[in-house]
Amino acid sequence: MSLDDLGLTDDPVEDGPTFEANARIKARFALEATGLPALADDSGLEVEALDGRPGVHTRRYAGPEATDADNNAKLLRELAGLPPERRSARYVCVLALARPGAPIVTRRGTCRGRIATEPRGSGGFGYDPIFEPADEPPGGRTFGLYSDEEKGRISHRARAARRMRPALEA
């Protein structure tokens, strides 16, 4: 069930410096708005050669109205000319679980890889067409070429969800 399903149209201000801070902000916001337990996600892409950028600005890296293609193009321009070993990146997901009267629980999942030199594939969203998981050779398949099932086994969100499961069952 989402906040939209409950008729809540306000969004929290995601001004935290980290994925964890923003996930906590969203979970606390949902808990306070509904009084119900809330599970929130904050995710993004970190590129080593860019000191972790785009990071918490992943969705709006090329500007507030930027499309996925705009964000991908900006990132590819910034990494132009770098060899595969300097294009290391990771997707990060932090899940935050907020329950009434309890501390917020967070779990982090990552998926390591590298940024391709050009987009390949149209599946997924965001940076998927330019993200090569670590198990792929340079020039191999990007997440844009993975099936939902394949991506679901190794994605940062899947890993965070597996780590959160015990807290959800408690």
What are these model-predicted stretches?
Residues 1-170:
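Anionic-ligand binding patches
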